[in-house]
C-alpha cells in the first residue's frame, strides 16, 4: 500500500473490514438531531477517527483534506469533528475562509441556537460536563473548558498576525497550545501551491496567506490543519502532489448525485427577451409552489436572477419589479403560446384544471413577487442582515422569492429551496482552439451544482427525506419538486457547452450507449430511416418472487361454467 494515496489506503482498510463505519456517541448526541447523519458522513467521521488514533503512518503536525461535494454537509462534518477533538483534549480552533459572507453564515450556524441551521444540540455535554461554544479574538484569555473559535477570512488572519494589535491574535498565542485550523472552501489557500517552482527570493521573503497558515500549523506538533472543499483541483499536478498523503475522504458531486442527494438539473432555453424569460421562470416557480401546497408540503420555492454586471443587475431589478406590477394577460398568454418545452404547456394546463384563470394568476404573481419580496445582493457593502436573509430563505417567516445577483453567491450559499436560475445574458466564452469549456461556463455549472442541493420532503415515513424519490416516475407531479431549472436564451452552442461542463463536474451523467440494430435494406431507403428516430425497448427480467397469491382481480371475478347432466 506504500505507493497508494492516503485516501486509497483508508479505502482498502474499510473494504477489508479493518475500519468499522461508526460514529462516537459524543458526536451524535451533541449535533442537532434534525440533521440526521448520512452514510457518507458516518464514513468521514470513521476515517478521521482512524487516522487520528490508529494510523501508524500519520504525520505530525497533521494536515487532512475532506473533499466533499457541494451540498453534502461539509459544515456538519466540521461541527462533528470539533466535538470529537474536544473530547480528545483540543480547545482552540481557528475557522478561516476566503469570503466574509461565509464567515457570517458560519457564525450563525455555530453560535446562534435560534437559527434554523444551528448545527449543535440545545445543550452540549461531553464526559458528563456541559460545554459552551464561544467566539474569541485570541486564546490567551479564553476559557480552556470551552470550545474557543476565532472566525476570520484568510486575508484577515494574515493581516491580524503580521500587523499585530492590542488584544489581537499573535503568533505567540500558538507557542504552547494545540491549535486546530479549519479551512472552509480550502482551495483558496493553494495560491502558492499552484505556482510550482519559485525563485529564491519568493521562497525566502514572500508573506502570503498560505504561508501564514503554514506558520501557525507548524508551531506545534499536535496541531491540525483540516481542509474542507468541493473544488480542491486535485488534478492540478502541484496540488495532487501536495495532497497525496493528505486526502482523507473523497465524495465527489458525481457520487452525491448518483446517491440521489441532489436535485436533477434541467436546462430550459427559450426565444424570449430577458423579462419574458424571467417571467417564464416565475410561472414555473409558482406552479411548483402550488404542487407543494396541493401535497400539504410547506416549502416556498425561490429563484435566482443572474446578470453579468452589477449595473445590469440593478437595471433589471427595476425592470422586473415594473414588469410584475404591470403584468397583463397578453404577456402571460405569449409565454403560453410560444412555449417550446412540454413543461410550460403542462403548467398552464394544470392551471386550467384547477380553475386558476390568467387574471387570478396575475394577482398571485403580483403579490408573491412584489418588490418587497425581491432582494438584490450585489454590493460589497451589503449588510450582515442581508447576508443572513439570503442564507435563511427556507425559514417560514422569510417571504423573499427572487434574488438578484452577479457572482455574490458563488460560494458559501447553501439555500435548499432554490429551484430556478435565470441567466440574463447571452455571451459564451468557449476555448475554441482547445475545445475546452470556458471559465465563465464552468463557473455557471458550479453555481448550478451549488443550487442543486436537494430540498427535503416526504409524503410519508416510507419515503427517504433527503433523497430523490421520483426519478423513475416521470408522470408524477412532484418530480418537478426534485428538479432545478436553468433558464437561458435560445443558444444551442452555449447549452451544448454547459452540458459538457455539467458532465465534467458530475452534475449530469453521460448516457451515450452504443446499440447494434439490424434492419432491412429496403428500410434504409425510407425517409423514416434517414430523418426519423428509432426507439429500442429495454427488456427487464420479471422474476415474480414478490408474487405470493393470485391477483385480487382474478380471485374476485365470478366465472360461469355449464356442465352437461
Model feature map: region roles:
Residues 90-96:
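Conserved catalytic segments around the Walker B and adjacent sensor/switch elements
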Residues 2-12, 31, 46, 88-90, ...:
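Helicase-associated low-complexity regulatory tails and linkers flanking the ATPase motor
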Amino acid at each position: 500500500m506504500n505507493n497508494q494515496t492516503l485516501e486509497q489506503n483508508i479505502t482498502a482498510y474499510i473494504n477489508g473490514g479493518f475500519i468499522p463505519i461508526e460514529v462516537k456517541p459524543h458526536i451524535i448526541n451533541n449535533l442537532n438531531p434534525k440533521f440526521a447523519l448520512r452514510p457518507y458522513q458516518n464514513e468521514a467521521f470513521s476515517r478521521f477517527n482512524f487516522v487520528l488514533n490508529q494510523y501508524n503512518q500519520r504525520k505530525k503536525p497533521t494536515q487532512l483534506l475532506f473533499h466533499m461535494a457541494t451540498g453534502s454537509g461539509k459544515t456538519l462534518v466540521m461541527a462533528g469533528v470539533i466535538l470529537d477533538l474536544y473530547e480528545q483534549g483540543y480547545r482552540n480552533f481557528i475557522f478561516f475562509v476566503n469570503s466574509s459572507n461565509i464567515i457570517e453564515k458560519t457564525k450563525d450556524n455555530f453560535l446562534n441556537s435560534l437559527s434554523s441551521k444551528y448545527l449543535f444540540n440545545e445543550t452540549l455535554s461531553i464526559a458528563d460536563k456541559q460545554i459552551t461554544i464561544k467566539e474569541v479574538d485570541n486564546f490567551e484569555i479564553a476559557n480552556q473548558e470551552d470550545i474557543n473559535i476565532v472566525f476570520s477570512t484568510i486575508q484577515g488572519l494574515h493581516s491580524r498576525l503580521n500587523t499585530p494589535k492590542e488584544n489581537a491574535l499573535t503568533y505567540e498565542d500558538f507557542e504552547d497550545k494545540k491549535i486546530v485550523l479549519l479551512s472552509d472552501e480550502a482551495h483558496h489557500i493553494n495560491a502558492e501551491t499552484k505556482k510550482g517552482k519559485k525563485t529564491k527570493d519568493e521562497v525566502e521573503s514572500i508573506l502570503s496567506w498560505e504561508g501564514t497558515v503554514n506558520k501557525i500549523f507548524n508551531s506545534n506538533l499536535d496541531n491540525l490543519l483540516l481542509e474542507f472543499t468541493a473544488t480542491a483541483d486535485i488534478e492540478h499536478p502541484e496540488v495532487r502532489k501536495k495532497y497525496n498523503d493528505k486526502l482523507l475522504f473523497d465524495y465527489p458531486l458525481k457520487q452525491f448525485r448518483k446517491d440521489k442527494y441532489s436535485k436533477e438539473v434541467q436546462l430550459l432555453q427559450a426565444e424570449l427577451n430577458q423579462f419574458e424569460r424571467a417571467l417564464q421562470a416565475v410561472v414555473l416557480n409558482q406552479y411548483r409552489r402550488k404542487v407543494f401546497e396541493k401535497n400539504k408540503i410547506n416549502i416556498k420555492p425561490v429563484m435566482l436572477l443572474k446578470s453579468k454586471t452589477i449595473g445590469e443587475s440593478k437595471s433589471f431589478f427595476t425592470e422586473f419589479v415594473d414588469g410584475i406590477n404591470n403584468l397583463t394577460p397578453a404577456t402571460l398568454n405569449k409565454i403560453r403560446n410560444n412555449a417550446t418545452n412540454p413543461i410550460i404547456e403542462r403548467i398552464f394546463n394544470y392551471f386550467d384544471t384547477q380553475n386558476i384563470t390568467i387574471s387570478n394568476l396575475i394577482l398571485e404573481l403580483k403579490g408573491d413577487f412584489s418588490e418587497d419580496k425581491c432582494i438584490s445582493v450585489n454590493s460589497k457593502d451589503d449588510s450582515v442582515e442581508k447576508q443572513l436573509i439570503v442564507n435563511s430563505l427556507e425559514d417560514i417567516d422569510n417571504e423573499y422569492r427572487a434574488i438578484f445577483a452577479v457572482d455574490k453567491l458563488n460560494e458559501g450559499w447553501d439555500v435548499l429551496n432554490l429551484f430556478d436560475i435565470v441567466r440574463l445574458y447571452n455571451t459564451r466564452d468557449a476555448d475554441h482552439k482547445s475545445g475546452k469549456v470556458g471559465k465563465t461556463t464552468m463557473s455557471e455549472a458550479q453555481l448550478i451544482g451549488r443550487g442543486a442541493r436537494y430540498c427535503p420532503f416526504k409524503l410519508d415515513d416510507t419515503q427517504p427525506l433527503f433523497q430523490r424519490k421520483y426519478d423513475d416516475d416521470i408522470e408524477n407531479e412532484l418530480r418537478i419538486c426534485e428538479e432545478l431549472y436553468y433558464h437561458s436564451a435560445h443558444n444551442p452552442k452555449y447549452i451544448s457547452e454547459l452540458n459538457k461542463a455539467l458532465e465534467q463536474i458530475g452534475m449530469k451523467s453521460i448516457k451515450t450507449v452504443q446499440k447494434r440494430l439490424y434492419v432491412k435494406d429496403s428500410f434504409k431507403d425510407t425517409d423514416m430511416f434517414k430523418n426519423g428516430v428509432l426507439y429500442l425497448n429495454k427488456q427487464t427480467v420479471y422474476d415474480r418472487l414478490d408474487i405470493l397469491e393470485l391477483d385480487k382481480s382474478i380471485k374476485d371475478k365470478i366465472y360461469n361454467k355449464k356442465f352437461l347432466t
